[in-house]
A protein has these predicted regions:
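A general structural motif at alpha-helix termini
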Residues: 8, 12, 58-61, 143, ...
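Short histidine/acidic/glycine/proline-rich micro-motifs that form metal-
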Residues: 23, 62, 115
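Asp-based, Mg2+/Mn2+-dependent phosphohydrolase catalytic module
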Residues: 76, 87-185
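Alpha-helical structural context
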Residues: 43-44, 81, 101, 131
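Structured helix-beta-strand junction loops
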Residues: 11, 80-81, 112
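Short, acidic loop-to-helix structural element flanking the phosphoryl-transfer center
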Residues: 26-34, 47-86, 96, 122
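A metal-dependent, Asp-based hydrolase signature
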Residues: 1-56
């Protein structure tokens, strides 16, 4: 199951990155998760999955994510001195549901769903800085994915890499070693 879950994650991510480059996005992360899951089910002859199973995997599971255990206690401390925002390819609804489940309080939430341009497009990052009335050089992008941080850095953001070696289970993350150009590792 771990391999299938990671394949679902990989393909859903691929379906989202750079969305909105040529035309307005036709789906959000929830939609991508569902159509990718249906592809994987078909490719692996897993037709035993019911519509309820598909809904539970594609929708309910990501809307019930539990965040990293060290994060809820540290978020309020960061907010004492900084604007702390969620900037994500996930749907607004996933962010709302997971924030409630994990008792997270953000200063602001930015979903690429509302911007109409998805990461890794430069416009997504630049738009967030503009909405915050900040220069890109005043923004720090914190993530555990080099590809996201590299894109943020390319438009002028400062970057911080957080190691999350268990994020992908036994398989390990696709890019476990931070790019040495990040500002904080």
């Amino acid at each position: 199951w771990g391999l299938l879950a990671n394949e679902l994650r990989r393909r859903s991510l691929k379906a989202m990155l750079n969305l909105g480059d040529k035309e307005p996005p036709q789906y959000n992360f929830d939609g991508a998760h569902e159509f990718v899951l249906r592809e994987i089910i078909k490719e692996n002859n897993l037709e035993k999955f019911s519509e309820e199973d598909i809904h539970n995997i594609a929708y309910k599971a990501p809307h019930s994510f539990i965040c990293w255990e060290d994060f809820p206690d540290n978020l309020p401390k960061l907010r004492e001195n900084y604007m702390v925002c969620s900037f994500t390819i996930l749907s607004y609804r996933i962010i709302i549901d997971t924030a409630k489940k994990n008792n997270l309080s953000w200063d602001c939430v930015f979903s690429c769903e509302g911007i109409g341009k998805y990461k890794l497009l430069p416009e997504a990052y630049i738009t967030v800085a503009k909405m915050l009335q900040l220069n890109v050089s005043e923004c720090l992008m914190v993530a555990c994915h080099n590809f996201d941080l590299d894109a943020a850095k390319s438009v002028g953001f400062k970057t911080a890499f957080v190691r999350r070696p268990d994020e992908w289970g036994e398989e390990g993350p696709p890019d476990p070693n931070p790019n040495p150009d990040h500002d904080i590792i």
